[in-house]
Amino acid sequence: MRFYASQNFTAVGADRKIVEKNPPVSYTDNSAENRTRKKPRRFKMATFYNQATLSFGGNVVNSNTTEAELLSGLELTKTAITGTYSATGNVVYAITLRNMGSTAYSDLTISDDLGAYTVGAATVTPLDYVDGSVIYYLNGIQQAAPTVTIGDSLQFGGIDLPAGSTATLIYQAAVNGAAPLAAGSTIINTASTNGGAGIGELTATATVAVREAAQLTIAKAVCPAVVADNGQITYTIIVQNLGNTPIIATDNVIISDVFNPVLTDITVTLDGVELAEGTGYTYSETTGIFTTVAGAMTVPAATYTQDSTTGIISTTPGVSVLTVTGTV
């Protein structure tokens, strides 16, 4: 069997098949469905305790101990500007660090775990920082890019934050082979900062959902490659779905072809089951135009397997095979 690029061959709807079950949300969407932005967190400073003492008649009685915490004026938020992710492409994030107090902070470091999660005994990251992508703003004015260090996590260093100011980092991360792709999957990304001397760590998270859609490819083969006049020939059309959403009848995907030379007495099968003319396909022995009926073509979703050692995810596409056999 040989594969050829087909002339006069189209798959109507295949390259336009996008089934979005979780369309991107806007940066400013604060609805309950938008889980990409978490409530801002403030730094905890020192915890302090206090106890009163009562003395009378040579006796000493201690009160209960009270506990309270000092809060700094720092606030950290993280937002995924890109609403969904797929096997290829980038996710855009924004981290905002706001100083609402009267104390200036210098040389702060903001870290990003790039969505790290555990697979077996290994920790893998489904995202890779896009080199040179970070843009740094202080009070809305672009600044020189911060120092970027990539180790166990992504770190932006040397950030100074005067009293009453707001720092914003916008950067991109590329989806890699460890990103989960099955329907319903998410990447949970955590940012943190040291807050300067004497201040505890603050974290903020952003969650991005996988894009749920079909992703179709199509190929065609002919057998035999050399056929005599009035001989029989079989065309095999293979449709693969690399996406996490199946093609179902209501998606109305159509395969069409023009057989030249024209075939006669054709037999058509889909995944080994014979299709009836009129309900499964239409064909003209005058023009050679062949078309499947809308709804006859279905393709299962891909399946995904993750290596427990490396964390790399392999994709097994869903496949449907259409054959057309006739006489030349």
Regions found by a protein language model. Give the residues of each.
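Intrinsically disordered, low-complexity segments enriched in serine/threonine/proline/glycine
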Residues: Q7, I18-K21
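Cationic, amphipathic, low-complexity segments that mediate targeting or membrane/lipid association
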Residues: T10-R16
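Exported/extracytosolic protein signature
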Residues: N22, Y27-V328
